[in-house]
Amino acid sequence: MNKNNAFIGLCLGLSMAFQVHAQKPVAAPMKDVNQVIDNTLDSLNKARTARPVPGSSRKGNNPVLFLVGNSTMRTGTLGNGNNGQWGWGYFAHEYFDENRITVENHALGGTSSRTFYNHLWPEVLEGVRKGDWVIIELGHNDNGPYDSGRARASIPGIGKDSLVVTIKETGVKETVYTYGEYMRRFIRDVKKRGAHPILMSLTPRNAWEDADSTIVTRVNETFGLWAKQVAKKEHVPFIDLNEITACKFETFGKEKVKYMFYLDRIHTSEFGARVNAASAAEGIRNYKKLALAKYLKPIEKDTVTGATRKKGCPVLFTIGDSTVRNEDKGDGMWGWGSVIAELMDTTRISVENHAMAGRSARTYLDEGRWDKVYNALRPGDFVLIQFGHNDAGDINIGKARAELPGAGGESKVFLMEATGKYKVIYTFGWYLRKFIMDVKEKGAYPIVLSHTPRNKWDNGQIERNTNSFGAWTRQAAEEAGAWFIDLNKITADKLQDMGFNEGLRVVGEYFKRDHTHTSLKGARLNAQSIVDGVRQIDCPLKNYIK
């Protein structure tokens, strides 16, 4: 018995020795710097019903572009923005010719390279065919404990280290590999299918290196570096999405970058998601001899906005609603933006009226009209901004063009009746501040106006917007550092004098068909009021007045 016990003891000792040898020390897991709770992965069955069936979008024999990532690519289970957060994968398809290639977003919030590979990848891989493309952007969640809680950390680095763990909550055993090893496994699996893998670095967070907030924190010493190293060794493309977007954020500045995110510092708003999607497309387009680029839509060049620019001269852009731009012909309704050039020295400055009837500040932005002006801006240009007439009413039904009232930082997610999609709506003043920040970013001059007065009277006094849109416009301008002209007051004072001295019949000649839209005479009156206001402020635009 003693000999048997000794033999058994020897075997146990050797077994333990071998286990210790197999479990040589590995690097500690990465710290969870995001501190964001995302339980999406905990509902895998629900997630599978929400995500597309792999390969189901394929048209004939066309290739499919599969997106593999986490919540920065697809937020939550549905990825539909119902919490105000959007992943860039939702908008990626807009950059591709979907008659030649389709895009499927298989990302899932809360996943790491390890958990995606173990739980979701086998199913995605089933849909991958020869000639397809797979973009892999993972790493945000490769942190925390190896063997408890979310148990999603990969071993830092790209080495061959491994670690056998037993998940404390479930008792399930699992071998954990390095981040680089998971990337290599993705790559090998894709190549075996005859498809093309692409690695991307992580989207940047709203984090800055310096006290002045001029340098965005990169991942070029961790996940970005490791993905790049693996891509090089495996001879696959690497696109530094982190660097491309971070450079844009640094141009935007800290205040503008804030609204690129929603609720936290890692998950993007629609604005930020669209920036990341554009950066991904830019990286694909600029990567030398990357065949995926041939499926991108051609870049559409705007040949209209800013086309009047004379060499060495600024442009005065006007944006707003129908009181700024209307029919602008004959005896019809006119907007002041179509006549203000009469008061400018057009040998030294050109004037372009980009207002559109029926628009609020929000819908002018949502329809992409502002983007055209923004992209055309050059240092030294001027932008006259006037909204307010169409910014009240329904937010998500009917015309659905209103904002939240006020000029604060509030926002709310609404389900839009017309589109069936979720959208974050901000205050009226927020949209004005965005326009102002964008103008200043380009080195141009923003001038914000309270909206034109209506031909509405109460006990002999013309109606003014002093306590509503006028006040919110002034507040937004002052907070964002723009010039403010109280157009509503300047013109209202003139109309008040006419109404008091000569009767309302004379005032009526300045309007057309209703109490809001102006005749040519009224448009010229408002244009003159703007010039009067410019002369009262210390704005360089006064140097271009006749």
What is each of the regions a protein language model found here?
Residues 108-113, 207, 356-361:
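Acidic helix-start/capping segments at beta-turn-to-alpha-helix junctions
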Residues 28-107, 122-134, 153-154, 302-356, ...:
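Serine-esterase "nucleophile elbow" of acetyl-processing enzymes
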Residues 77-81, 211-218, 328-331, 364-365, ...:
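Short, solvent-exposed loop/turn segments at secondary-structure boundaries
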Residues 1-25:
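Bacterial Sec-dependent N-terminal signal peptides
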Residues 297-304, 546:
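A short, charged, Gly/Pro-tolerant segment at domain boundaries
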Residues 123-270, 274, 281-289, 372-517, ...:
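Alpha-helical cap/lid subdomain in secreted, periplasmic
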Residues 112-123, 360-372:
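N-terminal post-signal-peptidase region of extra-cytosolic proteins
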